[in-house]
Curated annotation (Swiss-Prot):
Gene: Slc25a29
Membrane topology: Multi-pass membrane protein
Tissue and organ expression note: Widely expressed, with highest levels in the brain, including cortex, cerebellum, hippocampus and hypothalamus, and moderate levels in liver, kidney, heart and testis.
Intervals holding Solcar repeats: 2-86, 90-178, 190-275
Protein name in the entry: Mitochondrial basic amino acids transporter
Highest classification ranks of the organism: Eukaryota, Metazoa, Chordata, Craniata, Vertebrata
Record keyword Membrane present: yes
Amino acid sequence: MALDFLAGCAGGVAGVIVGHPFDIVKVRLQVQSTEKPQYRGTLHCFQSIIKQESVLGLYKGLGSPLMGLTFINALVFGVQGNTLRALGQDSPLNQFLAGAAAGAIQCVICCPMELAKTRLQLQAVGPARTYKGSLDCLVQIYRHEGLRGINRGMVSTLLRETPSFGVYFLTYDVMTRAMGCEPGDRLLVPKLLLAGGTSGITSWLSTYPMDVVKSRLQADGLQGTPRYRGIVDCMRQSYQAEGWQVFTRGLASTLLRAFPVNAATFATVTVVLTYTRGEEAQVDSEAALGTSPTPAGSALAQPSSL
């Protein structure tokens, strides 16, 4: 169990490192003004960040997701597995419900973590920097705004994470069963990578508009007076000013990120288990990832993609 958890965390770290540049592009595209847009699109945003801030600019705010990774994976694994066992039957509906429960519980850590990440990604470079790092960011927010400030965007995070994790685990379960992911299959790892990457894409598509709202609420007031009074007001103002397209802003970079992040996660989990458990790695990697050898087998699971 301990090695399964370690492998999941290692896979999550790999996923964060691969996906963080795409995430920072997504956030900047989501929150930029339409009146004076700084970036023309995903590629231009990448180029501008590297030109103005170097490659390191693509890893602003990396500490925050890495900091919360262990706890988030522990919650996701524990809650999803225990909920599925409590429900008693490994059915598609229960996969969705167990995943949704895991998504909801991990918001306690995910929300403050993403708040710090968003603030760090959007702050100026050089002497004008407000925060020295993820921890300093959260400390300053707490001093000025209290616990309410730390939990800014919690409701929108819950509305995003709860259904998206349900869709995530459901898609992964359906795909691994459909492809026949059996222990000993020489194509097992590619199949798991395909299932994980596709699951990441479908989960993002299911709740992406709420992610835009969440990013705007967490960035609100960073450069002046707050604009939004809440989720509904943010949606209304955003729609009136920019049309429905605003709720798909940054989607391209997010989907580009989703597949390789999950591919990196699954590959790392497999490698870690291979080197730590030798001949048992193939079976253990199935257990850690929750792959069921038969339709009535154990629950499917994977580390959080962040």
